[in-house]
């Protein structure tokens, strides 16, 4: 997929969300790790980044900020931090304000559209199992723990209480999560 229009990319808002989640001020080694990846936190983000670079960014920041966490928990915490950082971006504030008005149920209806502000490849199929109990299948997930953290923090931010987000199934690069709240 190198170089073509089918290349998976992550948009600036996603990189900006991670940067705002973790700095400044930067933990020792964080700024250097970013610069090594070609990301200068003092400069405006590029419009888009290759998915492979974003995965390296997640790994580097995760190891610096959550060094003692096992991998799945580290990425869960990264997903939660992503939402905290997203709330600090212009697009994030606007999007989360709208989603707070419509609540968790209708937020899930808009999931693919919301993820399209983050990247060019995420699709989500939603299935209602019962009121406030859903199954969400994502077509391409490299790090399920990260998605679980994003869903957890994102749904809490728009009003879901007593929330549970669990990985229900993993097939190739697809991942299915169950989500329920009160």
Question: Which residue stretches match the model-derived regions?
Answer:
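Short terminal or interdomain "cap/linker" segment that borders an active site or interface and mediates
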Residues: 4-19, 115-148, 155-182
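N-terminal leader/assembly segments
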Residues: 1-69
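Amphipathic interaction/junction segments at domain boundaries or subunit interfaces
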Residues: 39-145, 167-169
């Amino acid at each position: 997929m190198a170089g073509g229009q089918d290349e998976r990319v992550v948009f600036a808002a996603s990189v900006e969300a991670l940067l705002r989640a973790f700095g400044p001020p930067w933990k020792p080694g964080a700024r250097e790790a970013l610069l090594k990846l070609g990301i200068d936190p003092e400069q405006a983000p590029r419009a888009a980044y290759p998915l492979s670079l974003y995965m390296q960014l997640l790994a580097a920041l995760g190891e610096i900020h959550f060094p003692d966490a096992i991998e799945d928990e580290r990425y869960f915490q990264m997903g939660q931090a992503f939402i905290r950082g997203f709330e600090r971006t212009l697009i994030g504030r606007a999007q989360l304000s709208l989603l707070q008005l419509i609540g968790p149920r209708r937020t899930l209806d808009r999931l693919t559209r919301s993820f399209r502000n983050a990247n060019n490849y995420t699709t989500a199929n939603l299935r209602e199992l019962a009121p406030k109990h859903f199954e969400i299948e994502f077509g391409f997930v490299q790090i399920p723990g990260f998605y679980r953290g994003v869903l957890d923090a994102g749904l809490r931010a728009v009003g879901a209480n007593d929330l549970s987000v669990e990985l229900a199934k993993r097939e190739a690069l697809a991942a299915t999560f169950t989500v329920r709240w009160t």
